[in-house]
């Protein structure tokens, strides 16, 4: 799959990021991960991102990363394209990117670099180096320390033909509008704020109809129903699902930093696809929070 073909795929439909399965000892659970991917693939996501933020990329050892990407690529070879999360320092990100390409990933999501303070010119140089290290398509993720501006993205687009996507995790509407207007159809645009469904209607109005769903990990039918309601501008259905599920869900998620990942793993366990504990420094939901989430999921019915 060439970068332009990937761009076309990412320009429509729902995307998701499977959690990474760990056993009770905290080691990668390959069998559980395969089972998860086989469950999720038929629901109709346009692409799945292995070892992304929700997949706890930041906590993985290099050897685990290779096994996770290979498992995802092999399991989903005939069903859904797999993109791989990459990040860290520039040299680390290049190593991950080249390994993911070697293992057959169709593209990459370039996560924000390590927490070193840097100018955005330096961040752009980091992105350029990673893009030029591979031939597959790359989506850059503007979030936290990565705040690339429209002029910098335009420069990167000229220098890196395989940079085909922009994912927004900042929620800076002025910046998003400037990027969307200036770059036009050069990129595919993905909404990437935590619990992106809450912002989906607003982002669609900005020309960003595609987003990544974390809750697809445990209520995939509801996630797809919500996406289709957004696509057809069924405001009544969108409002009902936000009121009945997403707002109470946010009340739980917002209790602690890092719960955006922890709550998804809890949801997967409730759905019958236990992915094990999160890795430190993240913490799992408390027993009370888990039961609150279970009651909320139960109201969504069979998936």
Swiss-Prot record:
Protein name from the UniProt record: Probable 5-dehydro-4-deoxyglucarate dehydratase
Keywords, sorted A to Z: Lyase
Similarity-based family: Belongs to the DapA family.
Keyword Transmembrane helix on entry: no
Keyword Glycoprotein: no
EC class name: lyase
Xref: InterPro entries: Aldolase_TIM, DapA-like, Dehydro-deoxyglucarate_dehyd
Catalytic reactions of this protein: 5-dehydro-4-deoxy-D-glucarate + H(+) = 2,5-dioxopentanoate + CO2 + H2O
Pathway(s): Carbohydrate acid metabolism; D-glucarate degradation; 2,5-dioxopentanoate from D-glucarate: step 2/2
Organism per entry: Pseudomonas fluorescens (strain Pf0-1)
One BP term from GO: D-glucarate catabolic process
Gene3D superfamilies: Aldolase class I (3.20.20.70)
GO terms, molecular function: 4-hydroxy-tetrahydrodipicolinate synthase activity; 5-dehydro-4-deoxyglucarate dehydratase activity
EC identifiers of the protein: 4.2.1.41
Pfam families (UniProt xref): DHDPS
